Design a protein with these regions (language model features):
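N-terminal export/assembly segments and adjacent metallocofactor-ligating motifs
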Residues: 1-337, 341-342
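Long, low-complexity segments enriched in small/aliphatic residues
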Residues: 520-553
Length: 553
């Protein structure tokens, strides 16, 4: 028996592996049962690819199921591997600005209605990761905490990723054709369409909007600033002849009086903090310090009030009385205004300080009242305050009661169409629910928005707007001071800027970038290099004429 086994091993040189002892006996019933259950049938590829019902009805074993999954996964992976063919030529010497791991910085600007600043964007491998102040621009160069955090909204997954028509994803061509049909239909009915925007402070955008209104005369452009300074703008217009705001240089003032003006916060677009702190440097040891005196009258605690030397709590009504008392004292008028002993003492201190420091003093107010703003302008002109800059600030241009008139007409059904750009009036205005219902009843409504907010969600059309770090732009925050915004990354989603869309609607052959470049070469640069200004992010033109204070009687 041993000889037989030995011969068999010698003859069968091919190795045989057994999974269990039962496989030694080829006649075993257990072996036949195992062979029927394991790899018994061929993989039904036709059923996988073509017959879904047959696949579901098939009695599939666990191992066959794993085959199906493996096949489908492999097929999907192979299909995804088919990418576009990109022809590239390698660099002989690799440029420093595209070396992996080394960050690049680009100058751009932000103007979202709240913050206005020239900034530097740090990018790594083509992705913006951090915001810095552009210190080369002496004005509007401060990036506050909100500006620093704005890079996060670029990567927000809740952004609208494509245009929408009646709540459904669409294309830009379809959106454009639908919008043109509705605009023409409303025009034939002589219906009124309101274009509601923030203050753009952009000369090129303002020109594009004028071209749109020329093509569609039934469109009325109304400016809505979420943090308004409407009566300050109106007072400035009455005093200086055009819409704008007084710009203050607090570094030139040794005595500052503020009546509810949070100039270290959002007041008039911010940006006052750098020059304010430059005149508040205590250095008694070397006697080189400069410390201005700051008196703050306000109702709520603000960042400005927290930094004041003297902070006096007062209601808005009391603030108006305090301001009237200061005005009368400085001008030498008889004042019969009644104040509490504490308020009168501090108001007298403020008035005496203004008289003592004269042109080295300044008074500002954030009260949205026409009479208050008239008093402020007249008082600063009376003392010839050096803090009044020669150029007007253009970050707020909403004036008067045009927004109130718009709301009334919208609720009364006198408006046929509405276009909003970067605004959420349903959320920010007081009669939000009524406005929401009125917008949903309009024949035509279009919202340019990054998110499907309270306003855009009830609009007929939603135009997916890009992030400011994906956009081109130009701004004039202050007379003669121009700033450029450039994209620091390719658009992450299927978005389009408001300006590009309007240019396509009015039939322009140029895109927004080409329009900005042409406008600047013709009206701004005066022969300067476009690339140099784009690199720096700003350009300043000297202004020869001074602001002339000539108030209406």
């Amino acid at each position: 028996m041993e000889n037989v086994i030995t011969k068999q091993i010698i003859v069968n040189k091919k190795k045989t592996y057994w999974k269990n002892v039962e496989q030694i006996d080829k006649k075993s019933a257990l072996i036949k049962d195992i062979e029927n259950k394991e790899f018994a049938n061929q993989l039904p590829v036709d059923k996988i690819l073509l017959d879904q019902e047959g696949l579901e009805a098939d009695n599939t074993t666990r191992r066959d199921f794993l085959k199906y999954v493996g096949f489908s996964t492999t097929a999907a992976a192979l299909a995804a591997c088919e990418g576009p063919v990109i022809k590239s030529v390698p660099y002989v010497v690799q440029p420093e600005q595209i070396r992996p791991g080394i960050a690049n910085y680009y100058a751009t600007a932000i103007a979202d209605g709240f913050d206005f600043a020239s900034i530097l964007v740090k990018t790594r491998e083509g992705r913006p990761i951090k915001i810095e102040s552009n210190n080369d621009a002496s004005d509007f160069c401060s990036a506050n905490a909100r500006v620093h955090a704005s890079v996060l909204s670029l990567y927000d997954t809740k952004r609208i990723q494509t245009p929408k028509v009646r709540g459904q994803d669409s294309s830009w061509d379809e959106l454009k054709s639908e919008v043109l049909l509705d605009l023409n239909a409303v025009s034939k009915k002589q219906g009124k369409v309101v274009l509601l925007t923030q203050t753009f402070a952009s000369p090129t955008t303002n020109k594009i909007i004028k071209d749109l209104v020329t093509k569609f005369p039934n469109i009325e452009h109304i400016i809505l600033d979420t943090v308004p300074s409407s009566y300050a703008v109106e007072s400035f217009k009455d005093a200086y002849g055009f819409e704008g705001l007084v710009d203050y240089d607090f570094s030139k003032s040794d005595f500052i009086v503020s009546v509810d003006a949070d100039f270290l916060g959002d007041w008039q677009g911010g940006g006052y903090d750098t020059k304010y702190v430059s005149n508040r440097v205590p250095d008694r040891k070397n006697r080189k310090g400069r410390m201005s005196k700051h008196v703050q009258f306000e109702s709520n605690m603000t960042l400005t009030g927290a930094n004041a030397d003297i902070r006096v709590p007062a209601t808005p009504t009391e603030q108006k009385k305090i301001l009237s008392y200061i005005y009368s004292e400085v001008k030498g008028l008889n004042s019969k205004i009644k104040l509490s002993p504490e308020q009168k003492e501090n108001a007298k201190f403020a008035a005496d300080g203004i008289k003592k420091f004269g042109s080295k003093a300044v008074i500002v107010s954030g009260l949205d009242d026409k009479n208050v703003q008239d008093l402020i302008l007249d008082l600063n002109n009376h003392i010839r305050s050096l803090a009044i800059e020669n150029s007007a600030r253009l970050t707020r241009t909403q004036s008067g009661n045009e927004v109130d008139v718009f709301i009334k007409e919208l609720l009364d059904g006198k408006i046929s169409g509405l276009i909003t750009v970067g605004l959420n009036p349903v959320y920010s205005l007081s009669e939000g629910e009524k406005i929401k219902k009125a917008i949903s009843d309009l024949d035509f409504s279009l919202s340019f928005s990054m998110k499907e907010d309270e306003t855009s969600s009830v609009c007929k059309y939603i135009a997916a707007a890009p992030h400011y770090l994906e956009s081109w732009g130009d701004y004039e925050f202050k007379e003669g001071q121009y700033f450029l915004a450039q994209p620091t990354i390719r658009p992450l989603f299927n978005t389009m800027q408001f300006q590009d869309f309007v240019l396509s609607v009015i039939g322009s052959s140029k895109d927004y970038y080409a329009t900005i470049k042409a406008f600047w070469k013709q009206n701004v640069l005066n022969g300067r290099s476009w690339n140099k200004v784009l690199h720096d992010g700003f350009y300043k033109k000297s202004k020869k004429e001074k602001l002339k204070f000539n108030p209406k009687k």
